[in-house]
Amino acid sequence: QRQMCIRDSTQGWLHCDIPGTDASGVVKSMMDELIDEFRNCDMPNRVHITTSCCQINCGGQGDIAINVQHTKPPKINHDLVANVCERPSVVARCPVAAIRPAMVNGKASLEVDEKKCICCGACFPPCPPMQINDPEHTKLAIWVGGNHSNARSKPTFQKLVASGIPNNPPRWPEATAIVKRILKEYKEGARDWERINDWIDRIGWPRFFEVTGLPFTKYHIDNWRGARSSLNASTHIRF
């Protein structure tokens, strides 16, 4: 049966202590907008949509994924760092070595090298005084083409297709509109039993951005040179 599945990977504002958005709310909003697709089950193949309210803990591969995107480095409350945070652990947590110990106003604290910071939010859970959530600068991003399955093609990682989307509760209309647009083109253009990643592989990324009307920018290009030699994106046996 060609059905749709939407799930949130976390409890968002209801339960989690570090959310940048409310994943449960995003799911409810999109389910309301896509209710006919759930009733009719007439997509070319199963569509797995996921939402996450931070970039580091919850989440997973999905045909379409709506994730938080922080756009500013954390703001540090230096008065609280020494009493709340285990500074060596916070320094070690940063994936790009952008955090280092510092003395501020005679108190042990931390500082962030904003040129290195990638705004991932990994420092916030172990050190709440490093506040990164912001009503203006915390956005949403949409990724597509993630697939765990090894049935028709090799497993694939998600690719960014839209970023800087307003984090606009309670209905998130901007994010919902983009997801509906992607699903519309997939429904009309994909062949029977093609997953979204298979459809994109067949038509190509330039054609995908053309039919969906999404702007393509330099930030969509994955230029990390180490990806090919260090990331095993397939479960196929290689010699």
What are these regions (language model features)?
Residues 15-24, 58-63, 119-121, 200-219:
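Short glycine/threonine-rich loop-to-helix capping motif typified by GTGT followed
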